[in-house]
């Protein structure tokens, strides 16, 4: 598996793969969000905005031949001050690469990015992503009660909490 920073051409070249990642991770957008990624072209445009943004970095997870893109790690709202850095992270991947291998890749990306504090905001209904973050070393640092509407397995739209998870990079020599 190869990881590298995405460029604008990648957004279009891998638009079908990006679209599949968002189809696999339907809870990324709440039920009333105006963003609807329902075509590969919309998926490409959505990611292109992050690639072009000055305060974002998009990393792609590719197969060894770079024929397929299996996932994205988006560092957004990157900020630096007084030798410290912070960013919000968004992660999506295709259903073809769930498991221990992808967790190890995400772990390596988070360690290598060099950002001191990384945070994720995940709806409480999205149990799988919350558990992945916890396995990567993220800690629950807060929540926003009844913040986003989602349709549950019974077809009911309800307001769910947003869980805030934070990862603090350890300095060399710390355990």
Label each region the model flagged.
Residues 112-123:
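Conserved GNAT acetyl-CoA-binding A-motif
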Residues 96-111, 131, 135:
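Conserved acetyl-CoA-binding loop-helix of GNAT-fold acetyltransferases
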Residues 38, 44-84, 92-95:
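Acetyl-CoA-dependent GNAT
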Residues 125-142:
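Conserved active-site alpha-helix within GNAT-family acetyltransferase domains
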Residues 23-48:
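Conserved GNAT-fold acetyl-CoA-binding loop/helix
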Residues 88-98, 123:
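A short, internal acetyl-CoA/4′-phosphopantetheine-binding micro-motif in the GNAT/acyltransferase core
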Residues 1-16, 171-175:
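Conserved N-terminal entry element of GNAT/NAT acetyltransferase domains
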Residues 121, 139-156:
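Conserved catalytic-core motifs of GNAT/GCN5-like acyltransferases
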């Amino acid at each position: 598996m190869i990881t590298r920073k995405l460029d604008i051409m990648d957004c279009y070249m891998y638009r079908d793969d990006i679209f599949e990642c968002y189809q696999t991770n339907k809870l990324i957008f709440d039920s009333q969000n105006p963003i609807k990624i329902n075509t590969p072209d919309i998926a490409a445009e959505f990611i292109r905005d992050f690639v072009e943004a000055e305060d974002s970095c998009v990393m792609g997870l590719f197969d060894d031949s770079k024929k397929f893109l299996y996932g994205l790690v988006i560092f957004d709202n990157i900020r630096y001050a007084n030798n410290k850095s912070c960013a919000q992270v968004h992660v999506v991947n295709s259903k073809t690469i769930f498991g221990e291998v992808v967790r190890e890749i995400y772990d390596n990306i988070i360690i290598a990015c060099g950002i001191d504090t990384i945070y994720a905001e995940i709806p409480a209904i999205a149990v799988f992503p919350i558990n992945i973050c916890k396995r990567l070393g993220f800690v629950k640092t807060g929540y926003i009660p009844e913040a986003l509407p989602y349709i549950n397995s019974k077809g009911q739209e309800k307001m769910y909490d947003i869980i805030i998870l934070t990862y603090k990079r350890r300095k060399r020599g710390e355990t």
